[in-house]
Amino acid sequence: MDMKHSRLFSPLQIGSLTLSNRVGMAPMSMDYEAADGTVPKRLADVFVRRAEGGTGYVMIDAVTIDSKYPYMGNTTALDRDELVPQFKEFADRVKEAGSTLVPQIIHPGPESVCGYRHIAPLGPSANTNANCHVSRSISIDEIHDIIKQFGQAARRAEEAGCGAISLHCAHAYMLPGSFLSPLRNKRMDEYGGSLDNRARFVIEMIEEARRNVSPDFPIFLRISGDERMVGGNSLEDMLYLAPKFEAAGVSMLEVSGGTQYEGLEHIIPCQNKSRGVNVYEASEIKKVVGIPVYAVGKINDIRYAAEIVERGLVDGVAMGRPLLADPDLCKKAVEGQFDEITPCASCGGSCISRSEAAPECHCHINPRLGREYEFPDVPAEKSKKVLVIGAGPGGMMAAVTAAERGHDVTVWEADDKIGGQLNLAVVAPGKQEMTQWMVHLNYRAKKAGVKFEFNKEATAEDVKALAPEAVIVATGAKPLVPPIKGTQDYPVLTAHDFLRGKFVIPKGRVCVLGGGAVACETAETALENARPNSYTRGYDASIGDIDVTLVEMLPQLLTGVCAPNREPLIRKLKSKGVHINVNTKIMEVTDHEVKVQRQDGTQEWLEGFDYVLFGLGSRNYDPLSETLKEFVPEVHVIGDAVRARQASYAMWEGFEKAYSL
């Protein structure tokens, strides 16, 4: 496909704004914000870098109209005039980089974290948010005041030189979305009840914003084309409302889908969802309005984006995570350099998930995210002979980074292929997109001249003979089998070996020990692989020949896995009849039985299993580094060889250590 002459990369006029192309950067929470409402340089850099990469517009999320009601702790704001100059500096940087800045103007409403300050969040009705704070139903007078605040924030955005603003009434979320959705709005006055009444807040918000900006200043509106919940707003509701939003002053509709609490996977579609999940709704809405309509939601392939725009289904696309993975996505696409595009696998592992170790937005495959200009693409001061031991995600990232900096890089891999434990992760249904990472890194490695030796078990003697100036140890991890009573007396089967295909489970009763990603995906894979014939030992015939039990010591399954992946998988396991035991400690095992201790201290035997699989995670494997330090000038240990964690840490550490050589 010739992207340079595609409709996707043709200009689009929206009011006074001329976009260079029809790819926008969707709003995403970065958690780089400042306590005073200003835009820190680190946050601004993210958007400036995507502007440099050719994105048509960049949208910063959650710019609040009232700092008393912050969205996520630190929240960017346009609630007072003194913030306009610094916001103008931000907008000017984006413009100089070739794009335009669009702030998403919001009042978080029920989603405000003000409850931690002993201030009740505001909402159309009393609702409990994710922080277990109950919102206070606001009065008519408060509604009018808040509407005026939206207008003033819109004015400030235009004064700051922003190309447009975006308003958010999707996902039954934040204040406007909560008013619009019957799932949240239980009012019985003129702002509740009927669809027209529920839309009143949104329409008045749009009208007030329009009154406070120039007549042709663009106002974008994000909506859920379908809330995809029983009792929620439907596509038919949005087909009715979309022309009303246009008449109120909206210049462009951005069509998302789903609701925040009932189905986050519809808002942030990850590995369990197909691409373009909201394109159908967007295309139907486009038929009833005369303004541009953009689709958003797992549009993670630029060629697919070009296809749906070329077919006239939508006027443009908003891409989020793919632009985190590769800020130069648009430039590379226009130049036809598709192999050069760093692929987003929709994993949600670092951009959506947060942890104590990584509380901000990161990207598995792009270690530069959040530090856009800290690691320039320049050669190393001196070219070194570098050995990387292990070709998993961390080893591959290290090899690529070192070679692209001008080092002479050799990779030794004990297996017959690259990928490491990622080869196990992609076995589970819906996770095959992660194979793109290894394809991409392999392409870059070969282009940079990396030399590979497979089926090569590294020894100190061989390393000494090679005489590298630096070694990066990326030997990964081995399956964890704790010294539980019985493990020495019976053959131990691991989930890792099952996922590797070392044995199959055609039918029978299966107990998987553990409740993390490996264990749950093993259960899922076993169910998918089972033969469909009825198995007649009293098991649920609806799931075929197999009956699966999970035993997890923690209070819930999939701790640490992002919600858009976690919740659908748990629902799937339950729907397939998997017996889930949480708060349950493993005391003893045989090859057919498991003795467990419940939370109340009682113990019992779970019996009659044909297979007992250990899926309790991994432990680091590093047999060489200490010896190598005796004769290699530089030795760096990365990833699971340090401590078993998710692949992102291996790739970040591989990048950083290789860049430092």
UniProtKB/Swiss-Prot annotation:
Binding site for substrate: H168, C169, A170, H171
Enzyme class (EC, first level): oxidoreductase
Pathway entry: Lipid metabolism; bile acid degradation
EC number: 1.3.1.116
GO MF: 4 iron, 4 sulfur cluster binding; FMN binding; metal ion binding; oxidoreductase activity, acting on the aldehyde or oxo group of donors, NAD or NADP as acceptor
Active site: Y173 (proton donor)
Alphabetized UniProt keyword annotations: 4Fe-4S, Bile acid catabolism, FAD, Flavoprotein, FMN, Iron, Iron-sulfur, Lipid degradation, Lipid metabolism, Metal-binding, NAD, Oxidoreductase, Steroid metabolism
Disulfide bond entries: none
Function field: NADH-dependent flavin oxidoreductase. Stereo-specific NAD(H)-dependent 3-oxo-delta4-cholenoic acid oxidoreductase involved in bile acid 7beta-dehydroxylation.
Family recorded in the similarity comment: In the N-terminal section; belongs to the NADH:flavin oxidoreductase/NADH oxidase family.
Protein name according to UniProt: 7-beta-hydroxy-3-oxochol-24-oyl-CoA 4-desaturase
